[in-house]
Amino acid sequence: MNEVGIDVSKGKSMVCVMRPFGEVVLEPFEVLHTAQNLNDLAGKLKALDGETRVVLEATGNYHKAVAFVLHDAGLFVSVVNPVLMLAISMDIYF
C-alpha cells in the first residue's frame, strides 16, 4: 500500500509517498494549488503500483481543493483533525 502524506498550506502543499516500514516511494515534493498541478498530482498518485491512501490535515479552507480533486480522481482521501494528530503523535488519548 502507498501512504501519501500531504502538508497543506496557503497556495501549495508538500507531498510525500511512502510504503510500510519507511520505504520512500516519492521523495517530498511541492505542488501548487492550481487546477493543472492538482490534476497532475492525482495522475501521479493513481499511476503508483498498488493501493494508494491519502491523508491530510484540515487546514482552514486550504485543504478542500486538494481533497476534492484527489477524491474526484478516485483516490481514498482522509482529512484529519490536526489537534487529534498532535495528540496521537504525543501519545495522548482523549
For the regions a protein language model found, what residue spans apply to each?
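Phosphate- and other anionic-substrate recognition elements at nucleic-acid/protein interfaces
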Residues: M1-F94
